[in-house]
A protein has these predicted regions:
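C-terminal catalytic/motor cores of large multi-domain enzyme assemblies
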Residues: 2-310
Length: 310
């Protein structure tokens, strides 16, 4: 585990993007020859999927968030944009930390090459109201690798506030305008976008609205009360290599020392592009996930150092 620092405002050192590199990542060279070969034999992301289903003890999550929120009430600061520490904020911080410490998870395959992404980018969907016809907005937020739970919270606050308070949904307006055009023009426009992404030069307007250009797609299905979480596929289009869905924290019975007991658990469903790393790396990453869930207090601190994937 990398060292953490709870007081310094200095951010961890990161790799600087070079001028000639793709907008979203840089090509990796120091990887085994066999792994370089895999994208040539497994050409599509949809044909390279691994599915993981894991249930973790959530007891420490509940204690951690309860303590954070009690401290928030006792030390109320009207200037603090974080009014409550939520499950979504916690799980997104967890993802940022896991991707920072296990950087191969932040890889993607394009043009049969393996790339490391410049930033950690989490894509998710926000609903303005929970109804069948409630308006949705797709969002991609960018996080620094050393971020703690407050850093993530500030970015989430701004994104959620922007979506819920504005009636100007640029992504929705763009799609609405596009879909009014004839089919052959729609086909041509999407083809142009795909070509630009393929060669690594994507227009800024597309980067901000296209959830398929991200490190991971995240769905907190517990926020809509869903206990069982389905697996979600990945898309051949774009560069997203991982989809994580999390269900509602639930009670699970188990056989303890005093007979049948109950504990709080949470279900993770993870879909991954197996071309970005080997199975052993994925397993060790899930061990880190469990270690953080068992000791969530470490998310209070920024990482002092982050590994760089070359």
């Amino acid at each position: 585990m990398s060292k953490v620092d709870s007081t310094s405002t200095k951010r961890a050192k990161i790799r600087k993007r070079k001028r000639w590199e793709r907008f979203d990542g840089y090509r990796l060279k120091n990887i085994p020859s066999f792994q370089k070969l895999i994208p040539f034999t497994m050409k599509r992301r949809s044909a390279s999927l691994n599915y993981f289903e894991i249930t973790y003890d959530a007891g420490e999550i509940l204690k951690y968030l309860d303590g954070k929120n009690r401290n928030l009430e006792e030390n109320f600061d009207p200037n603090n944009p974080i009014k409550q520490y939520t499950y979504t904020q916690f799980f997104m911080t967890l993802i940022v930390r896991m991707f920072a410490l296990r950087p191969r998870l932040n890889r993607f395959v394009s043009r049969k090459n393996i790339y490391q992404r410049h930033n950690i980018e989490i894509a998710y969907v926000l609903k303005k109201d929970f109804s069948d016809d409630g308006e949705e907005s797709t969002t991609v937020d960018t996080f620094e690798r050393d971020s703690n739970i407050d850093d993530v919270g500030y970015i989430l606050h701004d994104s959620i506030k922007s979506v819920k308070e504005t009636t100007d949904d640029k992504s929705g307006d763009f799609v609405d305008t596009l879909m009014k055009l004839p089919n052959f023009i729609i086909t041509f426009v999407t083809w142009i976008f795909d070509v630009l992404i393929y060669i690594g030069y994507c227009p800024a307007v597309l980067r901000k609205i296209d959830t398929m250009q991200s490190s991971v797609m995240f769905a907190n299905l517990g926020s809509i009360g869903l206990e069982g979480t389905p697996h979600h596929h990945l898309y051949d289009r774009g560069t997203c290599s991982i989809f994580i869905s999390v269900g509602r924290i639930r009670k699970q019975k188990y056989l303890g020392e005093n007979g049948v007991e109950e504990r709080d658990v949470v279900d993770f469903k993870i879909t991954m592009d197996e071309r970005i790393a080997d199975g052993f790396y994925f397993v060790k990453s899930f061990e880190l996930l469990k270690e953080i869930l068992d000791n969530p207090q470490q998310l209070d601190d920024r990482l002092k150092e982050v590994p760089i994937d070359e």
